[in-house]
Design a protein with these regions (language model features):
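Short, Asp-centered acidic motifs that coordinate Mg2+ and/or phosphate
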Residues: 307, 339, 380
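Conserved nucleotide-binding/hydrolysis micro-motifs of P-loop NTPases
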Residues: 51, 62-64, 108-112, 126-129, ...
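Generic enzyme active-site microenvironment
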Residues: 309, 343, 382
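A glycine-rich (often HGG/GG-containing) alpha/beta subdomain
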Residues: 2-4, 11-182, 186, 190, ...
Length: 505
């Protein structure tokens, strides 16, 4: 076995350029060509907000960035310490007019966000001040205003970020709740990429051993041992990848928001509930049935979890074609929601329902409302109008709450139940392994998983080892495509991703 391992090591050195070249390219030729072309220009943009503020940050990146220091601050590159703020007069490069007093920071390549020479100007945030400096930068030869996401694109093309880190950065900029921020910061700092790189390395190692066996494994005893070891390694990896896929899309829910539909009969308090949760009157509340006819949506932060709350039309029989369209939309919202809150009038509902399980209560109410019931779905039952009943309401189910939208009685208890349900539906970014956060990532992981399955099928059937090796190569390529460190066949995905950033990022 010692001799066989020596042969494997020798083969790894001899064949690294041939066997692994296609699966380990960081960038395609077209990407490198575009990277070269983007380096010819120096870009600039306002990176802070466009509204009036105390301080604004203007970012410059590209080969001629040093000209900003020379011509607009009257300094030489040698006189400024990298990454140290220096207070200077900022002037027009043509006529020397004073534009502002501000801080200048110099980031020489490759130690910058973009990997290029970069400059930051921290100036007063008045609109006229910023406009004058932007106009002055346009006067410098080879300078142009950056496109949306172009700074991040250059960072990616320079190898400063991989595709998952770019996605994480985009999510971080869009994060509206604490749990979204936590998930995004983990991805932006490379935790998800680290997981995928580990998988890819494991596959490449198995590829090397399989190739060595094909070339040198004449000994049948050694061959059986190697194939068994490979089979075990890939089976373990397949189980890990399968668990990663079988996450109930919690990472994507956290990223995009949990869709919550409020359903029930007319006048049970659905609109009152959305108003009390949003702390403003977003829906019309009326004693007349059929007031709500269309879906009313609002995005909320509940305990750090993002939700899209949908108020729907009261479910009943109607001959009004407009109301019937609202009823159709209500049923559609319920069928596509991640969580359905069924609102009932506790003052008129039968007390025996309280003895049933949450799922059974939800099923019976859905049947009564002529609404499809999903046994695998997620439901909360809310008994409203607690102020109208004189008897105490005893609830034994964690997913059943009682409150009065009129007085607020029971609201805190309902919010606790709602937060618990949201925690089940979403990930806990601080306690769990990194999760899939986009359909792009999920697609590549699914395809990689199928290739691992095909590899195991070939080995179990004692099939062609060359075909088995090809399945590993394809699986490694799919994993590499998630971080875009595999061979990239198209750049459309990257273009769409970078365009989602704002100007100046």
């Amino acid at each position: 076995m010692y001799l066989f391992n020596d042969k494997i090591n020798m083969l790894n050195v001899m064949k690294s350029n041939r066997f692994f070249c296609n699966s380990s390219l960081f960038l395609s030729v077209s990407c490198l060509r575009r990277y070269t072309s983007t380096r010819r220009s120096t870009i600039f943009a306002l990176s802070s907000g466009t509204s009036r503020s105390a301080i604004s940050v203007i970012r410059i990146s590209g080969p001629n960035s040093v000209e900003v220091i020379r011509k607009m601050t009257r300094l030489n590159k040698e006189n400024i310490i990298p990454r140290k703020a220096l207070l200077r007069k900022i002037v027009d490069p043509n006529n020397g007019d004073l534009l502002d007093n501000g801080l200048v920071l110099w980031f020489p390549h490759p130690h910058s966000f973009t990997g290029e020479d970069s400059v930051e100007l921290h100036v007063h945030g008045g609109i006229a001040v910023v406009s004058s400096i932007i106009s002055a930068l346009q006067k410098l030869p080879g300078f142009r205003i950056a496109e949306a996401g172009e700074f991040t694109k250059r960072a990616y093309l320079a190898g400063k970020l991989d595709a998952t880190e770019v996605e994480g950065l985009a999510d971080l900029l869009r994060a509206e709740t604490e749990t979204q921020r936590r998930q995004a910061i983990r991805q932006a700092t490379g935790e998800l990429a680290e997981l995928y790189n580990k998988w890819r390395t494991s596959i490449l190692t198995c590829m090397a051993h399989l190739e060595a066996y094909v070339d040198f494994g004449e000994d049948q005893d050694i061959g059986h041992e190697v194939l068994s070891s490979l089979q075990y390694a890939i089976q373990s990896l397949k189980s890990e990848v399968g668990s990663h896929l079988n996450d109930n899309r919690r990472g994507e829910r956290l990223r995009n928001g949990v869709r919550v539909a409020i359903i029930g009969e007319p006048n049970v308090g659905k609109s009152s509930l959305i108003n009390i949760l949003s702390r403003r009157n977003v829906a019309i509340v009326s004693p007349y049935a059929g007031t709500t006819r269309d879906i009313v949506e609002i995005s909320l932060d509940i305990g750090g979890y993002p939700i899209v709350l949908c108020d729907t039309a009261g479910l009943r029989h109607s001959v009004d074609p407009v109301e019937n369209e609202g009823l159709r939309r209500a049923r559609e919202a319920a069928s596509t929601a991640d969580l359905v809150i069924i609102v009932m009038d506790v003052s008129t509902g039968p007390a025996k329902l309280l003895q049933l399980s949450t799922k059974e209560m939800a099923r019976l109410e859905c049947e009564r409302l002529n609404l499809s019931f999903n046994a695998e779905g997620n439901y909360l039952v809310l008994l409203n109008k607690l102020d109208l009943t004189s008897s105490s309401v005893s609830i034994n189910q964690s997913a059943v709450s009682a409150l009065s939208c009129k007085t607020g009685q029971g609201l805190e208890e309902f919010l606790v139940d709602l937060e618990k349900k949201l925690a089940e539906l979403c990930a806990n970014p601080m306690q769990e392994a990194p999760l899939i956060t986009s359909s792009r990532q999920r697609h590549h992981v699914q395809v990689a998983f199928r290739h691992l399955e095909k590899f195991l099928d070939i080995i179990e059937q004692q099939g062609d080892l060359a075909l088995a090796g090809e399945q590993l190569r394809r699986s490694a390529k799919q994993i590499g495509s998630i971080t875009a460190r595999g061979k990239i066949d198209t750049e459309e995905m990257l273009d769409v991703l970078f365009r989602s950033f704002c100007i100046g990022k």
